[in-house]
Amino acid sequence: ALADTALRQCLPCGPGNRGRCFGPGICCGVELGGCYVGTAETRRCAEEDYLPSPCQPGGQPCGSGGRCAADGVCCSADTCAADASCLEEGSERAEEAAEKNLTVLDGSAGDLLLRLMQLAGRQQGRQPGLL
């Protein structure tokens, strides 16, 4: 009975069967460089609906019930989205994302500092008792 409920790996798909099905119209793989959605490469994935046992795509859990499907991509059975938690460590895209986050952080910190200085300057220029 346990073998009946065990999840199997989803069907291979895409060019050279280098991807895995994530839904009836989604085929993804690191070797594919991303995902095919609703294309000829996903036709085989529709067969999953007719197989008696459920499958679970590989990859770490991500997003809302999805799994990491390719570098920086999280997919559920219905959709795919960019997800930084799916970036492979050390990949060029992971390094770019880290740099962008650092830049955003630096920009926010700079904006905050500038705003605080402006507020401090206004406070110094005011006379006591005036609003």
Curated annotation (Swiss-Prot):
It comes from the Eukaryota. GO terms for molecular function: neurohypophyseal hormone activity. Keywords: Cleavage on pair of basic residues, Disulfide bond, Secreted. One of its GO terms (cellular component) is secretory granule. SUPFAM superfamilies: Neurophysin II (SSF49606). Its main location: secreted. The keyword Isomerase does not apply. Disulfide bonds join 10-55, 13-27, 21-45, 28-35, 62-74, 68-86, 75-80. It is found in: Secreted. Neurophysin 2 specifically binds vasopressin. Belongs to the vasopressin/oxytocin family. This is Neurophysin 2.
